[in-house]
A protein has these predicted regions:
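A cross-family glycoside hydrolase active-site/sugar-binding cleft signature
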Residues: 58-60, 83, 139
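Core segments of cupin and vicinal oxygen chelate
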Residues: 15-61
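Alpha-helical elements of the RecA-like P-loop NTPase motor core of helicases
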Residues: 23-24, 91, 136
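A short, acidic/glycine-rich surface segment
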Residues: 43, 64-69, 112-115, 145
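Short, well-ordered turn and helix-capping elements at secondary-structure junctions
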Residues: 36, 61-64, 108, 142
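Vicinal oxygen chelate
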Residues: 2-5, 8-17, 47-51, 69-145
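Short, flexible, glycine/charge-rich loop motifs used to bind or transfer phosphoryl groups or to couple energy/partner
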Residues: 2-3, 47, 68-71, 115-116
Length: 145
């Protein structure tokens, strides 16, 4: 039995240590805007999105957060990958990230032998980290796909 409809990513929600700093960073780097506050028991979330909501990132704080730095070896989120159409798009993003002082991740969850954009059999990837050390990837399929 096949799934009824293809699914696609609706949003990503991340717990952060400094909500205001993370909101500013994500808005600057991704060109998105604060859209909505979402109060919840023990904290608050802020939804950030572009105008057509094709990219939506929710950032949350929790009163009970241990305020430890993120590490992908713990159970839960490993990293977040965002899709781009071409390697040329990755190159433009590389320049954009550099303009904001964002550098390629010094460590990734797998070896990256090419810097800053790694070309692997299944595509090309640019890996960087947010202020809480969460690994973010921009991914483009192999050319010709």
């Amino acid at each position: 039995m096949s799934p009824p409809e293809p699914v696609r990513l609706h949003h990503v929600a991340l717990t952060v240590s400094d909500l205001d700093a993370s909101v500013a960073w994500y808005c600057s780097v991704f060109g998105i805007h604060h859209q909505l506050d979402v109060p919840h028991a023990g904290g608050i979330g802020k939804v950030l999105a572009d105008d057509d909501r094709s990219l939506s990132i929710a950032l949350h704080t929790h009163d009970t957060s241990p305020h430890e730095s993120f590490h992908e070896s713990r159970t839960g989120l490993d990293h977040v990958g965002f899709a781009l159409a071409t390697r040329a798009d990755l190159e433009r993003w590389q320049e954009h990230l550099a303009a904001y002082g964002v550098q390629r991740a010094a460590e990734a969850d797998r070896p990256m032998t090419q810097a800053p954009i790694a070309d692997v059999p299944y595509g090309s990837v640019l890996v960087f980290r947010d202020p809480d050390n969460i690994q973010l990837e921009l991914f483009a399929p192999p050319s010709g796909h």
